[in-house]
């Protein structure tokens, strides 16, 4: 691992413990854990917001399509509607 033997890793860990102390390392670990937890929570909330936006866009498009076709039918001559239906179906 990183070109270090197990003995060198143990010595490195002991030096780090002596420099920072166990209390600071514990605090750093808990701070890192809280940061990761907050990041995951923010990602889940962002996904919920995106899902809600997509659903609202889908609903808007569906209602716009329904309204558009109704308006088109009201504007066209009923005879033309029958002719077009026979041509395309």
From Swiss-Prot:
Keyword Membrane included in the entry's annotation: yes
Pfam hit, one: TatA_B_E
Domain of life: Bacteria
UniProt xrefs under InterPro entries: TatA/B/E (IPR003369), TatA/E (IPR006312)
UniProt function note: Part of the twin-arginine translocation (Tat) system that transports large folded proteins containing a characteristic twin-arginine motif in their signal peptide across membranes. TatA could form the protein-conducting channel of the Tat system.
Protein family per UniProt: Belongs to the TatA/E family.
Record protein name field: Sec-independent protein translocase protein TatA
Organism: Haemophilus influenzae (strain ATCC 51907 / DSM 11121 / KW20 / Rd)
Gene: tatA
């Amino acid at each position: 691992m990183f070109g270090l033997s197990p003995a060198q890793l143990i010595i490195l860990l002991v030096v780090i413990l002596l420099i920072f102390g166990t209390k600071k390392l514990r605090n750093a670990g808990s701070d890192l854990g809280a940061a990761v937890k907050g990041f995951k929570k923010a990602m889940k909330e962002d996904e919920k917001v995106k899902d809600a936006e997509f659903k609202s866009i889908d609903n808007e498009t569906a209602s716009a399509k329904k309204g558009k076709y109704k308006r088109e039918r009201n504007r066209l001559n009923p005879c033309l509607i029958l002719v077009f239906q026979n041509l395309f179906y």
